[in-house]
């Protein structure tokens, strides 16, 4: 038995498979950060930190002895509970293909948004510096007129090239900006197609946890997401009508360079 205690849950294999697939599909649909950073691991739930490669001086109490302490990025542990009905579980055994897994979807969305917020906007309380606040480049203003969005992206691309950051470049858009870009045209030509041509090999990525937009290089080596325990489902408790489960993951995030992104802000 591991730390997830799944063996104690009154859930047969076929129902587990449906729950896991729903969680995986929803998480993947909502996640954006993993598409633009280097991902290492998973190395296991027991992993608690990743080295930054730096040290700091520690006052020595012995004459002639130097003491250094290695600096690490401690992992954070995300967990979100959800409840499924035993009716939905048992219906799978009866051959149902339409059990209600909405609680699974809601939990997967919650944890995906939390991971992306940490990567993109940081989590000060946990010592995680996000890509947006850590950028050394001045933010480019998102224009009021969506027809001018391509000009803002061109400006951001120019910034990255000027500071020597190679592509490919990807453009992350908040839900609101993604909708505007996808639904708008400029003299009959789709704005999204114009942006795609600007990016070349890069992607336009829906990022619901992002505020505004973000142009980032995906050349590699700039940002690292270190997974301890990747997204997993664990068991809390059950009664005669419901089973309480949870989604959990652990990770640390390192922003290794500060010049390889340009925020686009409202």
From Swiss-Prot:
Disulfide bonds: none annotated. Can be used as a bionanoreactor following immobilization on a glass surface. Nanocompartments filled with a fluorescent-labeled protein are stable for 5 years at 4 degrees Celsius and are taken up by mouse macrophages. The keyword Amino-acid biosynthesis does not apply. It is found in: Encapsulin nanocompartment. GO terms for cellular component: encapsulin nanocompartment. Keywords: Encapsulin nanocompartment. Its main location: other. Homomultimeric. This encapsulin nanocompartment is formed by 60 subunits, and encloses one Dyp homohexamer; partially assembled 58-subunit compartments with and without cargo are also purified. May assemble the shell from dimers. Monomers form pentamers, which assemble to form hollow shells with pores 5-8 Angstroms in diameter where 3 pentamers meet. Belongs to the encapsulin family. Family 1 subfamily. Shell component of a type 1 encapsulin nanocompartment. Assembles into proteinaceous shells 23-24 nm in diameter with 2-2.5 nm thick walls. Endogenous cargo protein DyP (dye-decolorizing peroxidase) is targeted to the interior via its C-terminal extension; only 1 DyP hexamer is incorporated into each shell. Empty shells can be isolated in the absence of cargo. Cargo encapsulation probably precedes assembly of the nanocompartment; may assemble or disassemble via dimers, subcomplexes with a distinct preference for even numbers of subunits are detected. Other cargo proteins can be targeted to this compartment. This is Type 1 encapsulin shell protein. The gene is enc.
């Amino acid at each position: 038995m591991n730390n997830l205690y799944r063996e104690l849950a009154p859930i047969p294999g076929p129902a587990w498979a449906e729950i896991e697939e729903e969680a995986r599909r929803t998480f993947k649909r909502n996640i954006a950060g993993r598409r633009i950073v280097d991902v290492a691991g998973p190395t296991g739930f027991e992993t608690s930190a990743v080295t930054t490669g730096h040290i700091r001086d520690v006052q020595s109490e012995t004459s002639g002895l130097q003491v250094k302490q290695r600096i690490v990025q401690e992992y954070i542990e995300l967990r979100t509970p959800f409840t499924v009905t035993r009716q939905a579980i048992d219906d799978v055994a009866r051959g149902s293909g339409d059990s209600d897994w909405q609680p699974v979807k809601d939990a997967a969305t919650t944890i995906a948004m939390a991971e992306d917020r940490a990567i993109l906007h940081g989590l000060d309380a946990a010592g995680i510096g996000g890509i947006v606040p850590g950028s050394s480049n001045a933010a480019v203003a998102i224009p009021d007129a969506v027809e001018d969005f391509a000009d803002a992206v061109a400006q951001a691309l120019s910034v990255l090239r000027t500071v020597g950051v190679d592509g490919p470049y990807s453009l992350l858009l908040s839900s609101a900006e993604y909708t505007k870009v996808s639904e708008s045209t400029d003299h009959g030509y789709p704005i999204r197609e114009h942006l795609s041509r600007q990016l070349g090999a890069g992607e336009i990525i829906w990022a619901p946890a992002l505020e505004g937009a973000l142009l980032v290089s995906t050349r590699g080596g700039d940002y690292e997401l270190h997974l301890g325990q990747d997204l997993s489902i664990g068991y809390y408790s059950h009664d005669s009508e419901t089973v309480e489960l949870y989604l959990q993951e652990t990770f640390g995030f390192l922003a290794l360079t500060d010049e390889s992104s340009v925020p686009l802000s409202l």
